[in-house]
């Protein structure tokens, strides 16, 4: 869980620069021997680099969830060529998933469950992410419109974790890791004060999801930071719900390790859909400040190897658990986390 007595304030350039100068350590050889690992968002960037590293660490099975079959097959062939003849091509399986479409996410989980016996899904790495220069929307299964970035960055990983939960609970030592960012700490009490002080006449409260996704307050940066905050709320909700389930079934030990990781500022194609000016600036900025995608992916990979209560609900960054404190108070966090998590489960039909 997050802590509220650590360093405060928005994440600085100097913090990012230190990460670039001090990349994390790679995972030990053979780390995934006998394990089945599933990764989403792995056709390029950090997700691809994580898949490549895991493929070289002797997994039993590696499932690549990519937007299209063609992108996934291209990634598979590149991984096979890079790792070399020691990697059997049958180990890698490609299954398409469009994370902006919740019905596609459900179909993906159905396909995986059909081909994955109970007790054999060891690691799930949720690395699909999206940044857009403008507010685009998609319609969910109930007809409600949401920003595409919110669906990809928050709803899809939440749904994946919930859909895979029974399969993960049947696998001893299973891990679900979501790729996040400590930039969730950039959301401040001032940013959320309108939500906490407003009420709907009918229900007594205002929808937190509608507030965060209001087109009148949408900016690329705000949407990114707040999506990361909501993803932390999802993480805490998964941990708390599991604890409640364990308490009601004391004789069963079916605990899944849920955690987040932050790869740091990395040189990727995240801003590929932005204008030339933004892309040029980020290229220069990343050249000076950032890690390579390969270095950032090390954090994703080593995070999957963590075990124990010490890691539960934590964020793994720079080879340690993050100690940065949120930009909102502990009381604000408790209120918002509960509201956001319950609303997300309602949207996903998991309430």
UniProtKB/Swiss-Prot annotation:
UniProt-listed InterPro entries? NAD(P)-bd_dom_sf, SDR_fam
Top-rank taxon of the source lineage equals Eukaryota
Query: EC number(s) for this protein?
Result: 1.1.1.-
- Which amino acids does the record list as binding NADP(+)? 46, 66, 98, 224, 228, 268
Extract one GO BP annotation from the record: antibiotic biosynthetic process
Is Transcription one of the keywords UniProt gives this record? no
- Sample GO molecular function, one term: oxidoreductase activity
Which pathway does it operate in? Antibiotic biosynthesis
List keywords of the entry alphabetically: Antibiotic biosynthesis, NADP, Oxidoreductase
Positions of the catalytic residues: 224, 228
Q: What's this protein's function? A: Short-chain dehydrogenase; part of the gene cluster that mediates the biosynthesis of sordarin and hypoxysordarin, glycoside antibiotics with a unique tetracyclic diterpene aglycone structure. First, the geranylgeranyl diphosphate synthase sdnC constructs GGDP from farnesyl diphosphate and isopentenyl diphosphate. The diterpene cyclase sdnA then catalyzes the cyclization of GGDP to afford cycloaraneosene.
Protein family (similarity comment)? Belongs to the short-chain dehydrogenases/reductases (SDR) family.
* Name this polypeptide is given: Short-chain dehydrogenase sdnK
**Protein's organism:** Sordaria araneosa
Q: Which gene encodes it?
A: sdnK
């Amino acid at each position: 869980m997050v802590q509220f007595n650590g360093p405060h304030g928005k994440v600085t350039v100097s913090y990012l620069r230190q990460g670039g100068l001090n990349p994390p350590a790679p995972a030990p050889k053979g780390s995934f021997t006998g394990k089945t690992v599933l990764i989403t968002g792995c056709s390029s960037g950090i997700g691809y680099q994580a898949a490549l590293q895991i493929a070289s660490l002797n997994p039993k099975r590696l499932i690549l969830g990519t937007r299209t079959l063609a992108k996934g097959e291209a990634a598979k062939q590149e991984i096979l060529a890079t790792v070399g003849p020691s990697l059997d091509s049958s180990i890698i399986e490609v299954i398409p998933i469009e994370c902006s479409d919740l019905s596609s996410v459900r179909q993906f989980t159905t396909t995986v469950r059909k081909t994955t016996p109970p007790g054999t899904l060891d690691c799930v790495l949720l690395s699909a992410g999206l940044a857009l220069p403008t507010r685009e929307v998609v319609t969910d299964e109930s007809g409600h419109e949401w920003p595409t970035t919110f669906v990809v960055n928050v709803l899809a990983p939440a749904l994946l974790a919930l859909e895979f939960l029974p399969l993960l609970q049947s696998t001893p030592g299973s891990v679900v890791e979501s790729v996040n960012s400590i930039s969730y700490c950039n959301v401040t009490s001032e940013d959320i004060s309108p939500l906490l002080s407003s009420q709907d006449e009918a229900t007594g409260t205002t929808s937190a999801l509608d507030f965060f996704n209001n087109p009148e307050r949408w900016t690329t940066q705000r949407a990114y930071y707040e999506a990361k905050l909501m993803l932390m709320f999802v993480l805490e909700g998964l941990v708390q719900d599991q604890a409640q389930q364990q308490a009601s079934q004391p004789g069963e030990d079916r605990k899944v390790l849920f955690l987040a990781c932050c790869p740091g500022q990395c040189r990727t194609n995240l801003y590929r859909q932005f204008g030339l000016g933004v892309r040029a600036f980020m290229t220069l900025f990343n050249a000076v400040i950032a890690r390579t995608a390969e270095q950032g992916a090390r954090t994703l990979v080593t995070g999957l190897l963590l075990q124990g209560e010490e890691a539960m609900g934590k964020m793994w960054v720079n080879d340690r658990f993050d100690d940065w404190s949120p930009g909102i108070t502990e009381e604000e966090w408790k209120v918002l986390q509960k509201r956001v998590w319950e609303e997300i489960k309602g949207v996903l039909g998991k309430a």
